[in-house]
């Protein structure tokens, strides 16, 4: 699910922390990718012309394999070395969220049964998409044959991706879930595995710039995210994103906010603190997640196992042999050529000061107003 409203807060208060770039900008980078999130995207987006999932002659779903194979090739073509991280066992605190998701599935199944148009059926079918154990195992087999490293995290994939980035094994964590920032990955890449046809730029979010720009410690930032709404527990009812940020900046922690509300000083009867609220446990899952120490992980990209890959994709899954062989050639070329060094690897990056961040944010707001005024003038001339 991620963190509700976090992207909007960062976009408004620290726009300079989000850099929008073409995939070519990440040439020479190693990236840890949230595999479970990617597989979900592929199952949703990689479809036949009639809107149904891709299947082979035996009726087995192949959308996830098609997406994994070709999106990985696209990264390799652009000089990126991807590694994938799969979810392990979900934390116990996530059981409430998983129960809610199961309830929503039951409701969606009812709506699907009642749907009268093909468009409505397709809409409900996509809401029922779920990454299964079999999908994960098939994707892991594919990656192994491609020579692309993957890791099965003890619990949350995003936490393990962040750990790899923090220990310098990769440049960034890639996921659509904004909660990846709570694990303090140096950089979060969003939209990396999107289809090229979408023409959506990759959003690179700098965690340190976010913290500096919001003037929050990582502990306060995590508390803000819990207040906004995360997968681990409920948030205070009646408190929206704007108020949540204001409360954290004023009081500094959830403990102080709870005291403020319970004392009656807030004069707001609409704010309701959840009963037995496990925010402290949620906080620790973000600040001290269960991960494999990044220093103990050795990521290795190997030549693809050409014969086995053709057997798996073409013989078993009925992919086009011509296209698969072409893909293997691209893969061999990309992995063999290695990764050239980047110029910025020779220089120390100096963090921006609060004054520089404020100036950048001011410039961004001024440019926004200027563009609005230009649009008004253009419309007036018409």
UniProtKB/Swiss-Prot annotation:
Changing residue 176 to A: Deficient in exonuclease and gap endonuclease activities, but retains almost all of its flap endonuclease activity. It is found in: Nucleus, Nucleolus; Nucleus, Nucleoplasm; Mitochondrion. Residues 1-105 are annotated as: N-domain. GO terms for biological process: base-excision repair; DNA replication, removal of RNA primer; double-strand break repair via nonhomologous end joining; gene conversion at mating-type locus; maintenance of DNA trinucleotide repeats. Keywords: DNA damage, DNA repair, DNA replication, Endonuclease, Exonuclease, Hydrolase, Magnesium, Metal-binding, Mitochondrion, Nuclease, Nucleus, Phosphoprotein. GO terms for molecular function: 5'-3' exonuclease activity; 5'-flap endonuclease activity; DNA binding; magnesium ion binding. Changing residue 240 to D: Can only cleave double-flap structures with a 3' 1-nucleotide tail. Has no exonuclease activity. Mg(2+) 1 binds at residues 34, 87, 156, 158. Pfam families: XPG_I, XPG_N. Residues 120-251 are annotated as: I-domain. Mg(2+) 2 binds at residues 177, 179, 231. Its cofactor is Mg(2+). DNA binds at residues 47, 71, 156, 229, 231. Binds 2 magnesium ions per subunit. They probably participate in the reaction catalyzed by the enzyme. May bind an additional third magnesium ion after substrate binding. Residues 370-382 have a biased composition (Basic residues). Residues 339-347 are annotated as: Interaction with PCNA. GO terms for cellular component: cytoplasm; cytosol; mitochondrion; nucleolus; nucleoplasm; nucleus. Residues 358-382 are annotated as: Disordered. It is an enzyme of class 3 (hydrolase). Its EC number is 3.1.-.-. Present with 6120 molecules/cell in log phase SD medium. Belongs to the XPG/RAD2 endonuclease family. FEN1 subfamily. Interacts with PCNA (POL30). Three molecules of RAD27 bind to one PCNA trimer with each molecule binding to one PCNA monomer. PCNA stimulates the nuclease activity without altering cleavage specificity. Structure-specific nuclease with 5'-flap endonuclease and 5'-3' exonuclease activities involved in DNA replication and repair. During DNA replication, cleaves the 5'-overhanging flap structure that is generated by displacement synthesis when DNA polymerase encounters the 5'-end of a downstream Okazaki fragment. It enters the flap from the 5'-end and then tracks to cleave the flap base, leaving a nick for ligation. Also involved in the long patch base excision repair (LP-BER) pathway, by cleaving within the apurinic/apyrimidinic (AP) site-terminated flap. This is Flap endonuclease 1. It comes from Saccharomyces cerevisiae (strain ATCC 204508 / S288c). The gene is RAD27.
């Amino acid at each position: 699910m991620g963190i509700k409203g976090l992207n909007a807060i960062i976009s408004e208060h620290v726009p300079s922390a989000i850099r929008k770039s073409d995939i070519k900008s990440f040439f020479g980078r190693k990236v840890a990718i949230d595999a479970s999130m990617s597989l979900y995207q592929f199952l949703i987006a990689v479809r036949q012309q009639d809107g149904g999932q891709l299947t082979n002659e035996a009726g087995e779903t192949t959308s996830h394999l098609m997406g994994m194979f070709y999106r990985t090739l696209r990264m390799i073509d652009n000089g990126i070395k991807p590694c994938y991280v799969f979810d392990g066992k979900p934390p116990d605190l996530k059981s409430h969220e998983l129960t809610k998701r199961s309830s929503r599935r039951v409701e969606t199944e009812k709506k699907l049964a009642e749907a009268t148009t093909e468009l409505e059926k397709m809409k409900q079918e996509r809401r029922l998409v779920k990454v299964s154990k079999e999908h994960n195992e098939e994707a892991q087999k594919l990656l192994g044959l491609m020579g692309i490293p993957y890791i099965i995290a003890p619990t949350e994939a995003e936490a393990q991706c962040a750990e790899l980035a923090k220990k310098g094994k990769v440049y960034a964590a890639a996921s659509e879930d904004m909660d990846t920032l709570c694990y303090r990955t140096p950089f979060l890449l969003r939209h990396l595995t999107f289809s090229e046809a979408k023409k959506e730029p990759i959003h690179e979010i700098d965690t340190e710039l976010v913290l500096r720009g919001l003037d929050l410690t990582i502990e306060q930032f995590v508390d803000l995210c819990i207040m906004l709404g995360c997968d681990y527990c409920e948030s205070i009812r009646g408190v929206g994103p704007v108020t949540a940020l204001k409360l954290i900046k004023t009081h500094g922690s959830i403990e102080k906010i709870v005291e403020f509300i319970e004392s009656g000083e807030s004069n707001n009867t609409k704010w309701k603190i959840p009963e037995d609220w496990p925010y402290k446990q949620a906080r620790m899952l973000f600040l001290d997640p269960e991960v494999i120490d990044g220093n103990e992980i050795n990521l290795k990209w190997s030549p693809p196992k050409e014969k086995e890959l053709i057997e798996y994709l073409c013989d078993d899954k009925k992919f086009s042999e011509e296209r698969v062989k072409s893909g293997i050639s691209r893969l061999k070329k990309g992995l063999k050529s290695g990764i050239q060094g980047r110029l910025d690897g020779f220089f120390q990056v100096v963090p921006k000061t609060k004054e520089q961040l404020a100036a950048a944010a001011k410039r961004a707001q001024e440019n926004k107003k200027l563009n609005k005024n230009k649009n008004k003038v253009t419309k007036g001339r018409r």
